[in-house]
A protein has these predicted regions:
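N-terminal low-complexity, Ser/Thr- and acidic-residue-enriched intrinsically disordered segments
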Residues: 23-104, 114
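Lipolytic serine-hydrolase domain surface
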Residues: 233-359
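Serine-dependent carboxylesterase/thioesterase catalytic core
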Residues: 173-260, 264
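Surface-exposed intrinsically disordered loops and tails
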Residues: 58-87, 133-175, 271-285, 289-290, ...
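Short, solvent-exposed loop/turn elements at domain surfaces
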Residues: 55-57, 119-122, 258-259
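Bacterial Sec-dependent N-terminal signal peptides
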Residues: 3, 9, 13-36
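A conserved cap/lid and substrate-binding interface adjacent to the catalytic center
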Residues: 82-190, 210-216, 244
């Protein structure tokens, strides 16, 4: 099993870590997008995008995040203020923060989890941890999530605000005590890419430990790979239904990442997002066969919301080449593309490559 993880590493390092939409492809679509009818999704995607603020400069992260949240030209309209965090894992690979909207009564809250940062090898472990299942510790027998998802969840729960030292649990308990028992505040949990996958398991934890008694939860994930098996997803669905909570999985149909890890065959059948190079085709076939052989059957959680597709205008490499494929993958997965497809204003920050990734 460990040997096969190197195939994952090869695929992700060859394709994902070198995928940089440095050409700044404009989004070409005739559809106004989900965001025109769902401002919640636009706000959550904006918060997810801002989780990448100064990801390689943690000393400036908090101040930069406050500046970005204050901007009135974003979908967040300057209404959301930093209330907890940013919190970082020891190696800096994971980041999470919480905000509140004081323009409504009771206040609304949101937790945003950062996606994959290829500058931090620990993120590779969380992405590549899909090669084995671990029991989901807050569910029942048979509820399993990827090893990477469990590692990531444990990190999120252990992380503390870089200024106050408060954990997420301490923060949630604090704001819970500020409201009467009869009043529930809205809580949003969101993330993009790996952040979306971690937002899924964090949302399950949130309900499983009883926070639905204080908050009305709505989860929005964007471009998220799947987190667990069918039993976990059934548990996820049950606890959301019991809590009268909502979970939306927002995807660009031409984004490669949401097909991981349960719909890999569809990547080949649909040539997602464009003509697959032979090496990518071969590795995905091998990965799919491996998951089937070892009964690692992944299922996506949440209500599917499919965005309109978009076409990059500056990916002009030969069809079937690795360069062309990387260009399409980067464009379709980027936070700026998701914001555009939602009809939301662009942010100044989003998922960006490390210096060593730039070509």
């Amino acid at each position: 099993m460990k040997a096969f993880s190197y195939i994952f590493l090869l695929l992700f390092l060859v394709i994902m870590s070198s995928c940089d939409d440095s050409l700044k492809n404009p989004v070409t679509t005739n559809n106004n997008g989900l965001g025109t009818s769902n401002p919640e999704a636009s706000v959550c995607m904006t918060l997810a995008s801002l989780s990448y603020v100064n990801e390689n400069n943690p000393a400036y992260m908090k101040d930069s995040l406050k500046i970005q949240l204050a901007k009135t030209n974003y979908a967040t309209q300057g209404k959301w203020i930093l209330d907890w965090g940013p919190a970082l894992s020891p190696d800096g690979g994971n980041m999470m923060y919480a905000v509140k909207d004081t323009s409504v009564n009771p206040y609304s809250y949101a937790i945003a989890v950062r996606g994959t940062d290829w500058c931090f090898p620990f993120n590779w472990k969380e992405d590549l941890g899909a090669v084995e299942f671990d029991p989901y510790p807050y569910g029942g027998t048979g509820d399993s999530i990827s090893h990477g998802a469990l590692v990531g969840l444990n990190y999120l729960l252990a992380m503390t605000d870089t200024s106050t030292g408060k954990s997420l649990v301490t923060y949630l308990n604090s704001i819970s005590s500020q409201h009467p028992d009869s009043t529930k505040s809205s809580m949003f949990i969101t993330g993009h890419s790996l952040g979306g996958m971690l937002a899924t398991v964090l949302s399950a934890w949130f309900l499983d430990v009883g926070y639905s008694s204080k908050f009305e939860l709505t989860t929005y994930t964007f471009a998220a790979p799947s987190a667990g098996n069918q039993q976990f997803v059934q548990h996820y669905t049950n606890i959301f239904n019991s809590a009268d909570a909502l979970s939306y999985r927002v995807v660009n149909p031409n984004d490669l990442v949401p097909y991981f890890y349960g719909d890999l065959a569809d990547v080949i059948v649909g040539q997602i997002p464009t003509t697959l190079p032979y090496v990518v085709d071969a590795v995905i076939l091998a990965m799919d066969a491996y998951f089937i052989k070892y009964d690692l059957i992944y299922v996506q959680a949440g209500i599917l919301n499919t965005l309109p597709s978009a076409t990059p205008t500056d990916c002009t490499y030969p069809s079937g080449s690795l360069d062309q494929y990387e260009c399409y993958v980067a464009f379709n997965h980027h936070t700026s593309t998701y914001l555009s497809l939602l009809g939301a204003p662009q942010t100044e920050y989003g998922d960006t490559p490390c210096k060593w990734e730039q070509r």
